[in-house]
């Protein structure tokens, strides 16, 4: 889970700020959903985006079911790598610090990486560069299905 990842990295790298958005979340009474306040979204998710676009994006955020962040994926050697994966690394991400992003990439081998010098929302902060790099990478993927054993 994401919480476990944070605990692991925090124990290995004391003093590294891994707070992200966590401290600014607002919770429903049953703690099943978290809500990102607009000011927090602007400061942590959208800090490098056009101000008007950032405000529009922040206004569209909705409560998030915490079950999604608690998921633990079980990878198998037989299935891992059958579907090409692209990780978009956001080097200035204030929500998921780069050290956590890189650890996630280590845990899911064989992913291709696009590294952008932007915050948490590259599709809004650098849409042209993201599209260019995605198109280039996708053009290199095979369109045929791999043989099954």
PLM ranges: what are they?
Residues 134-145:
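Short, hydrophobic alpha-helical segments
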Residues 28-82:
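Conserved alpha/beta-hydrolase catalytic His-Asp/Glu region
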Residues 1-38, 68-69, 73-74:
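Flexible "cap/lid" loop of the alpha/beta hydrolase fold
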Residues 7-14, 46, 50, 62, ...:
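A generic structural signal for secondary-structure junctions
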Residues 59, 63-128, 141:
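Conserved serine/cysteine hydrolase catalytic core
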